[in-house]
Amino acid sequence: MPARAHTPTYHFSKARRLLDSSEYQAVFAAPDRRISHRYYLLLARLNDGPEARLGLVVARKNIRMASDRNRVKRVVRETFRHRAGSLPRMDVLFLPRRGMDGLAPARQTRLLREAWAELDRAFQGEC
């Protein structure tokens, strides 16, 4: 039987999530990088773990409808999931701003792909 080529896994397992408030607080308290955009804020901090991890902070104040909040979170998770293997070991917090829910999902996806690429460039050479 031929050996299988290694294919990347695109799961969004618990190991790729920030799970408790102390993990969120560590990033809020001392982010290594801030990427600010009209529609979102990314805070990132290098971690000692094996891979990049994501935390979402989606306030009802910024996105009123629950369905819109869920859609934004789904797009963020999906784009992160596809890019996580190539990102440096870091903890990332994603905070959407007002107006993010008004964008089409395709535009949200494009913005987030650009954000992950910018974050990757920001940490180049530090990991």
Q: Which residues are covered by each model-predicted region?
A:
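Positively charged, solvent-exposed patches that mediate nucleic-acid binding
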Residues: M1-C127
